[in-house]
Regions:
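Transmembrane-helix bundle segments that line or gate the permeation/cavity pathway
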Residues: 2-7, 46-57, 62-65, 72-203, ...
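Extramembrane terminal tails and long inter-domain/linker segments of multi-pass membrane proteins
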Residues: 1-28, 130-146, 175-211, 284, ...
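Central hydrophobic cores of alpha-helical transmembrane segments
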Residues: 360-370
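Cytosol/matrix-facing juxtamembrane amphipathic
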Residues: 448-488, 528-544, 559-596
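Long, contiguous internal "core" modules enriched in hydrophobic/ aromatic residues
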Residues: 21-22, 27-46, 141-335, 433-439
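Membrane-targeting alpha-helical segments
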Residues: 486-568
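N-terminal signal-anchor module of multipass membrane proteins
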Residues: 1-78, 414, 418-420, 431
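Short aromatic-rich membrane-water interface segments that cap or initiate transmembrane helices
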Residues: 62-74, 136-157, 244-256, 322-336, ...
Length: 596
């Protein structure tokens, strides 16, 4: 898919660097002020919670999970689209992702940060957070309960956050190098030198990076599915009416993709206008994102119908009452808001004209974000506020502290995104250059030094390499601004062994996960939980699978990235080795051994 038709490589660099190198606009400062005020309100609400305790919130004897867990699940869902765009679409070679993946990855990281705030505060004593980690403590052999879905959450979300972070960071190395070589101020140059890890764009480094990104995509794909699946287990493994259902895992995953793409679409529509990136995030990209939202929304609609049909055919009066209460009870307004926002409005995306309408896309994206929040609210609150004893029935109403924390996370999320837009490239310039059409970029005359050949296109580069090899010249190194397909073969580079190493790293995670769960739950401190004694490892293995699975992915991803850095000799403050700065922008350099 052609991203551009009339942009040179240098123009792409100029366009993407402009929001970072230019002065912040008045609109940016206004948005910064608003988001900062919202963040400060959230900080005040958190301080009140820590000072007065959970009683400052709207929780009561029935609805112990309400605002916090609703917001937690919603933010985790928002964070799903970034890794999905980066990983799944990369594996399927969908080139349209390159204009949106970098901002989507940043959105994932910022959203997961917001999500982590709510369960930490919900602990009641957040200063004892470290008790959720399997580390020795002053109580002797008191370990975490690996049979608990709440602990599965800790491992799943921590793994998801860290893998998404390294995935994002590795992809940013060429972008940081481009900004480093363009920087005029010494402080900026030092910062981007630190962030780029001395990236020089050598051919072998590009080969390793391409394989590393593919392997990370392969690791992140099951991780994306596992995270919201495990989040759904918080509800599905309970015996609460309205929660105890097997449809929750796929239902939650589809809903996460739905809300995540809605937030990505909303952010990118705003950014393309404010930062003048219409040539990169085109109407075609918006149409494709709306298509994904249409598919995900249709799956969510089917899940709603399936969930309702299952409850009605269950012959359980308690299950039937929960769904009847949702549609006609005290929170019916929330239920029907969910239906309109998540089912009715997105189905209008069947019309191509509406899929390509900026105004309608913004409206649908906002509606889906609102609707998916109400979905989580309906699932949690309406299943709890009417229990088995009518005498204990109650209503939940959020306090200003509840509202303040949620508004604070919204403000902090957009505040981070504003700072990101002023400091980091919002578009993966190296990937955009690699998939652009045949542009009319400015050609510079080929310059020959004693050992350098400077070229202006990948086609010229490959032709020159063939010519030099036919002349018997020794090519010492090649530097390119982006990954050039066919370059490794032209230079005769051997395939890396990162794939085999990643498999071994996954085995290390498997053995560590098995040992950890066996030692803590079976050998050192066996516990009888709910009448289920931890007698043998194999009897309890199904409950240990989520933690073991996450540790396999954690070890495989992080040790892979460490191996990539070591093999490519990349580290903070390393001095870049590219002989000319333009090799990170729009020039292709061949370093040839002088015959002298």
């Amino acid at each position: 898919m052609q991203i551009l038709n009339d942009k040179s490589y240098h123009t792409i660099s100029e366009d993407i660097a402009r929001p970072i190198e230019g002065r912040a606009s008045r609109a940016w400062w206004i948005a910064f002020g608003i988001t900062l005020l919202a963040t400060l309100w959230g900080i005040w609400a958190i301080w009140v919670t820590l000072r007065d305790g959970i009683g400052a919130r709207g929780l009561n004897k029935n609805v112990g999970w309400a605002w916090d867990i609703t917001n937690f699940v919603w933010w985790i869902g928002i964070g799903h689209a970034g890794t999905l765009i980066s990983a799944v679409l990369l594996l399927f070679r969908q080139q349209w992702r390159v204009a949106i993946n970098r901002s989507a990855e940043a959105m994932t990281i910022f959203a997961v940060l917001q999500a982590s705030i709510f369960p930490i505060l919900h602990l009641g004593r957040p200063w004892l957070l470290h008790f959720n980690l399997p580390i020795p403590n002053q109580y002797g052999s008191l370990w975490d309960n690996f049979n608990s879905p709440l602990l599965w959450d800790v491992f799943a979300i921590a793994t998801y956050f860290s893998v998404s972070l390294v995935f994002w960071w590795v992809g940013l190395l060429p972008d940081f190098a481009m900004l480093r070589d363009r920087a005029l101020k010494p402080f900026q140059k030092k910062i981007y030198s630190l962030l780029s890890f001395g990236w020089s764009g050598r051919a072998k480094d590009w080969q390793r990076m391409e394989e590393t990104m593919l392997l990370l995509a392969g690791i992140a794909t099951p991780l994306v599915i596992s995270v919201h699946t495990i989040v759904s287990f918080d509800f599905a493994t309970s015996v609460v009416s309205g929660w105890h259902t097997t449809i929750f895992p796929p239902y939650f995953v589809a809903g996460a993709i739905f809300s995540g793409f809605a937030m990505v679409s909303l952010l990118l529509i705003i950014l393309r206008k404010v930062c003048k990136l219409e040539a990169y995030t085109t109407l075609k990209h918006i149409e494709l994102m709306n298509t994904v939202m249409l598919v995900a929304g249709s799956i969510v609609a089917v899940a709603y119908l399936t969930e309702f049909f299952t409850a009605m055919r269950s012959h359980s009066e308690f299950e039937q009452y929960v769904f009847h209460n949702r549609a006609t009870g005290a929170y019916a307004w929330a239920f029907w808001t969910m239906i309109i926002c998540n089912i009715v409005l997105p189905q209008l995306l069947w019309f191509k004209k509406l899929r390509r309408s900026i105004t309608f896309s913004v409206c649908v994206a906002l509606a889906v974000c609102v609707g998916m929040w109400f979905e989580r609210f309906v699932i949690i609150v309406t299943s709890l506020h009417r229990g088995y004893l009518p005498s204990s029935w109650t209503m939940f109403s959020p306090t200003w502290v509840d509202i303040g924390i949620f508004v604070g996370t919204l403000g902090f999320f957009f505040l981070l995104f504003l700072l990101y837009a002023r400091s980091f490239p919002m578009i993966a310039q190296a990937e955009v250059k690699g998939v652009r059409g045949q542009g009319t970029g400015v050609r510079e005359q080929e310059s020959l030094n004693s050992y350098l050949l400077t070229l202006t296109s990948p086609e010229e580069l490959l032709d020159k390499i063939k010519e030099l090899k036919s002349e018997g010249r020794e090519i010492q190194e090649v530097y390119t601004p982006f990954y050039v397909h066919g370059l490794a073969e032209a230079l005769g580079l051997k395939r890396t062994r990162l794939g085999k190493a990643t498999f071994l790293y996954g085995l290390i995670g498997l053995f560590f996960g098995c040992w950890l769960t066996y030692f803590t739950m079976i050998k050192d401190w066996p516990m009888d939980i709910g009448g289920k004694p931890n007698a043998t490892f194999w009897q309890n293995l199904p409950a240990f699978v989520p933690v073991i699975f996450e540790l396999v992915l954690y070890f495989a991803a992080h040790l892979l990235v460490i191996s990539f850095f070591i093999r490519s000799r990349l580290y903070p403050f390393k001095k870049a080795e590219n002989p000319i700065k333009k090799s990170s922008d729009d020039k292709f350099v061949i370093q040839v051994r002088d015959k002298k």
